[in-house]
Amino acid sequence: MAVKTHHYETQNTNNNNNIYNIQVLNNYDKTDYSHLTERDYLRCINDVTQCAKTLICKVHFDPKKPENHNIYIPCIKNNLIMVYRNKTWEVEDRQKMIDDLYDDNQLALEEWYAQYSEKYPEFIKLFNQYINNISDNDAVLKDVKKMIVRMLYNKKQIVIKTRNQSLLKYGEEISGNVLPELSNETFLQL
């Protein structure tokens, strides 16, 4: 009697489905604040001295709002910043942009606060403390702006990842890090 041996071949198939739901980047001047909730603003105000920095982080580095990933600092050693405008990345003066970024977000906090201060009276003291600290002490404001600079540098990979995914979605050929990751030598030439 002969024994029949069956050889079975296993075939593994891997499917990778990458879904990118990336919107077109907003121009820096058209940054969208509409996704922010009352809770987001309250968390910012609760950070007292750092509330503008906290708002900037929520607006420009929120993974749920990649279209606002439109500003970052590529190199901490110089005075330049990258800003997305008119479908391109532009090199700008860092100090001027930090001042504008701070002022824009400070204004957004003040407008929100004016609208909701009666609803959240317990935050009146915190917000007034913030305004007084910033108004009365230039050193506090300088420290907050230094923290904003560090945040824009430390979170640059979020912006780079968004840009890379956006380029993949539109079929553009990319290799490695497509955002201008400029070296110190490049910045010295600018």
Task: Write out the residue ranges for each language-model feature.
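Extended amphipathic coiled-coil helices
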Residues: 1-190
